């Protein structure tokens, strides 16, 4: 075979599929080592304020790559595109990865896309807190290859929370429970009679209330109930809500009865200073709890203290959202709820549970809580931009700023 024929075979080896069947797409992504919930077909339904396309990449008629591309339409017929946690391909094969990326760029140019933002599900470094950070050679090589292919790299930003994720691995579950601080927090939650409830759409209202409380407390805009509903409906039994709750009225009645008993005992031991001191301390504690629950017990029989929304997809899972009623922060319910949510993810077949982003400095408040779960800090390689029209870079930069707002 002549050299020219070999070159032609190499060029025609790959084929981009621009209308991949949804079921075929999802089957490929869900079982792929680099697959991700945010690249699932269902995520396109959740992000219903975007258009979307399912791309496939074939090698000798075999599907070897896929990408769910979210699309926003811009003035004058232009588009902005986003490939969350993708594309999906064997990133250990640099040649194939770059070829797929170039094919996406060429296709995007034909669609008049000014920018294609993507953040592959590739680890640059993975380590437990306190361990040495060792950078993956594969990750470094991939960054270099994508840059050479024309992608603009933004991964150096340590303030980008989506780049740093706290992940719990199934084999580390026993180590979580050996932590002294964690055990203490669980003991408080148990003493406060925090109960666990797993639910779905039937408790959407309670979850949304907790999220709205969190939104108000943090002074940030969060999703509305319809968004959480779409996630639960889209992923069905793969998704769940997990709550921490207390039998509020029952607890209040018990506190009242115990407080009355303590008052009676105090009246009968005026000449026993040590016993009185102990009883007075107990009375103060009971009175504090009484005052804390008095008005709340009039409003509701059961109080929902905190809740999370989680989804299992393939061998991974994500705790996507978490809300809390700050009035019950002393109950330490999140420790118990997150633990049970992680266990539930593993029971549904996941091997890893992603607790969400943390600051790259590893010193933020989020990590103070998440660090109790012995997580692996998965430092992904970060975000890239493809610019199909490089000469329109200034316009593309404005689109990028717009995209950061829109992709939420």
What kind of feature is each model-predicted range?
Residues 1-12:
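Short, Lys/Arg-enriched N-terminal segments with co-localized hydrophobic residues
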Residues 17-77, 123-125, 129, 137-139, ...:
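A conserved beta-strand-loop-helix scaffold within acyl/acetyltransferase catalytic domains
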Residues 22, 130-173, 347-408:
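Active-site/acyl-donor-binding loops of N-acyltransferases
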Residues 80-82, 115, 241, 316-318, ...:
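Structural preference for beta-strand elements that scaffold enzyme active sites
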Residues 82-84, 310:
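Catalytic phosphate/metal-binding cores of nucleic-acid and nucleotide-processing enzymes, i.e., regions
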Residues 86-93, 322-331:
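A short, internal acetyl-CoA/4′-phosphopantetheine-binding micro-motif in the GNAT/acyltransferase core
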Residues 94-106, 329-343:
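Conserved acetyl-CoA-binding loop-helix of GNAT-fold acetyltransferases
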Residues 109-127, 346-357:
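Conserved GNAT acetyl-CoA-binding A-motif
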